């Protein structure tokens, strides 16, 4: 009996130990499960917190971007509303005050321009070159602040060096030829090798640009080079044709410049008094204050102005005649080109007969001056195409968030604001004149410039040949 009790007691102890072991195992398992569960929960919570943080950061970023976009839009809208014309929200007194300032400053600029034109072709050419310098300065200044922030080395130095190179290529040769007449030993070399010296300057600028490249701003530096070359092409190259027009006769400079000024004035006043009263939509999205009424009205007034102002300019030889080899401030007299002379137009007999038979109209002959009809073509270009030069400039101002390129002229802005349409107009005049008006003849000035590039021995050969030809033609010697 006692033995059975002992056996039963042992079995109970074993069962209890097994139960305790299983219980401890279950506790460990549950503990590990709890730890895994808590770890998973922690990772889930951490992931959720990271996700929430990312959402908060993204939301802040989006808010900042939205704020920046709103600010940028406000700046652009503000510059658009103020860029060219008066704000629609301005009170009448403020509008008329701005109109008065703009009118007074415009009259001053026209007066100064008239004084420059009354001097000499050379002075007018220098005036155009001075305008190029000011336009280049204003355009480069748009990106100078950004370049300064990025610490671009020699930014201004390289820009002005490329400008000097382009000036030397386009304008130095005539000056060197003139100086070679007085100091042949010094300047003859530069006349003969002008093209080589121009190329050498370009190579120097190219190498200097490569040497100034800095890691981290490569893209920006190349964009700056592109910007500079674009300015040189748009300003210096096109202005070179303006100067060529001047020496063909001041009329080819005064007339197109006056057409652009006239178109700008009448577009402003027509838009000021009639804008959006008949067509309530902007002319161009890039420049919302430009109106259809101003555009259409200015075209009509510009056509009338070009026709009659051209007739006025024909009264003066110093405006019509090309410069040639005359000295500084000398009076000009020339045999006028047929385009400046009156012609009689007679209608063909067939047209005269039809007009009288069906319309009861007698078509009589009339006199006209060809240049006045050419002036109408120039006026159409100046009214329909040249204003896009202004829209191009407006796009640049919107891109860089500025109202005007400068504030040198109150109510008008900078030099670029006043000459943005003149460059493409000057190029058009050069192409139109050489294509449809200029007669095919040998230019003595061009021959003289080439003779001055020769050495003294070569000049003596030319001299002897010319002497023999003149003596033979005049009969002073026998053949």
Swiss-Prot record:
One of its GO terms (molecular function) is phosphatidate cytidylyltransferase activity. It is found in: Membrane. The chain crosses the membrane at residues 109-129, 160-180, 193-213, 241-261, 294-314, 376-396. Pfam families: CTP_transf_1. This is Probable phosphatidate cytidylyltransferase. Pathway: Phospholipid metabolism; CDP-diacylglycerol biosynthesis; CDP-diacylglycerol from sn-glycerol 3-phosphate: step 3/3. It is a multi-pass membrane protein. Residues 1-71 are annotated as: Disordered. Its main location: membrane. It catalyses: a 1,2-diacyl-sn-glycero-3-phosphate + CTP + H(+) = a CDP-1,2-diacyl-sn-glycerol + diphosphate. Its EC number is 2.7.7.41. Residues 130-159, 214-240, 315-375 are extracellular. It comes from Dictyostelium discoideum (Social amoeba). Residues 1-108, 181-192, 262-293, 397-479 are cytoplasmic. Belongs to the CDS family. The gene is cdsA. GO terms for biological process: CDP-diacylglycerol biosynthetic process. Residues 1-28 have a biased composition (Basic and acidic residues). GO terms for cellular component: endoplasmic reticulum membrane. Residues 53-69 have a biased composition (Low complexity). Keywords: Lipid biosynthesis, Lipid metabolism, Membrane, Nucleotidyltransferase, Phospholipid biosynthesis, Phospholipid metabolism, Transferase, Transmembrane, Transmembrane helix. InterPro entries: PC_Trfase_euk (IPR016720).
């Amino acid at each position: 009996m006692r033995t059975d009790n002992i056996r039963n007691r042992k079995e109970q102890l074993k069962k209890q130990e097994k139960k305790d072991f299983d219980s401890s195992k279950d506790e460990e398992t549950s503990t590990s499960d709890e730890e895994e569960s808590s770890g998973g929960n922690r990772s889930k919570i951490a992931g959720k917190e990271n996700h929430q943080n990312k959402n908060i950061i993204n939301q802040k970023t989006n808010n900042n971007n939205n704020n920046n976009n709103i600010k940028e839009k406000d700046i652009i809208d503000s510059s658009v509303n103020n860029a060219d014309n008066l704000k629609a929200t301005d009170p009448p007194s403020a509008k008329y005050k701005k109109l008065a300032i703009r009118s007074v400053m415009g009259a001053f600029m026209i007066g100064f321009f008239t004084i420059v034109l009354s001097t000499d072709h050379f002075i007018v050419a220098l005036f155009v070159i001075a305008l190029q310098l000011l336009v280049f300065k204003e355009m480069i200044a748009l990106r100078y602040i950004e370049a300064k922030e990025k610490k671009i080395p020699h930014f201004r130095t390289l820009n002005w060096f490329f400008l000097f190179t382009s000036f030397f290529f386009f304008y130095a040769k005539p000056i060197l030829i003139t100086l070679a007449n007085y100091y042949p030993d010094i300047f003859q070399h530069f006349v003969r090798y002008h093209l080589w010296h121009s190329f050498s300057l370009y190579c120097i600028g190219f190498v200097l640009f490569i040497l100034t490249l800095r890691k981290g701003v490569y893209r920006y530096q190349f964009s700056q080079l592109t910007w500079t070359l674009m300015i040189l092409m748009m300003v210096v190259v096109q202005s070179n044709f303006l100067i060529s027009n001047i020496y063909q006769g001041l009329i080819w400079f005064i007339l197109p410049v006056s057409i652009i000024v006239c178109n700008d004035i009448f577009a402003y006043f027509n838009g000021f008094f009639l804008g959006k009263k008949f067509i309530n939509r902007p002319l161009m999205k890039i420049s919302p204050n430009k109106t259809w009424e101003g555009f259409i009205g200015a075209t009509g007034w510009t056509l009338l102005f070009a026709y009659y102002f051209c007739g006025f300019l024909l009264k003066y030889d110093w405006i019509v005649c090309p410069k040639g080899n005359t000295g500084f401030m000398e009076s000009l007299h020339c045999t006028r080109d047929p385009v400046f002379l009156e012609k009689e137009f007679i209608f063909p007999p067939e047209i005269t007969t039809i007009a009288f038979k069906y319309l009861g109209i007698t078509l009589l002959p009339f006199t006209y001056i060809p240049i006045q009809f050419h002036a109408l073509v120039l006026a159409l270009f100046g009214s329909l195409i040249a204003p896009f030069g202004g829209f191009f400039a407006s796009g640049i101002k919107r891109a860089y968030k500025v109202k005007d390129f400068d504030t040198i002229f109150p109510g008008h802005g900078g030099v670029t604001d006043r000459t943005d349409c003149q460059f493409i107009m000057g190029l058009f005049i050069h192409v139109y004149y050489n294509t449809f008006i200029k007669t095919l003849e040998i230019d003595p000035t061009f021959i003289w410039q080439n003779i001055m590039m020769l050495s003294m021995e070569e000049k003596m050969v030319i001299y002897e040949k010319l002497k023999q030809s003149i003596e033979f033609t005049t009969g002073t010697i026998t053949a």
